[in-house]
């Protein structure tokens, strides 16, 4: 157990730059390029495997990815507010995720509507499903 953890910033440290892509290129990216950039940026650990909720191993390819665009926890923020404000960024994210698996499920609240993403990877099928009800209706495990 830590009593404290101190992280010192190196004043001579260099910025890290990542490759960038326009919206039309995202769905055509190679899954290994996506994985490499997610890992280098530290975002790989945001993914969770089921049933044990661990970060996936590098190189692992899921049968499907579930994007939970709802939260039914009491007093939870409605993610649709942010998604609607940044719809292009949300769709770009779905296009990138589509390169990682053959199926992507976007799960949203029954009262919300999401326009379908314009372009996904050629090998991917993206499905939209709506859910209603109180908690735990918004949990990924419930959607699976």
Residues of each region from the PLM?
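Buried, small/hydrophobic-residue-enriched core segments of structured protein domains
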Residues: 2-144
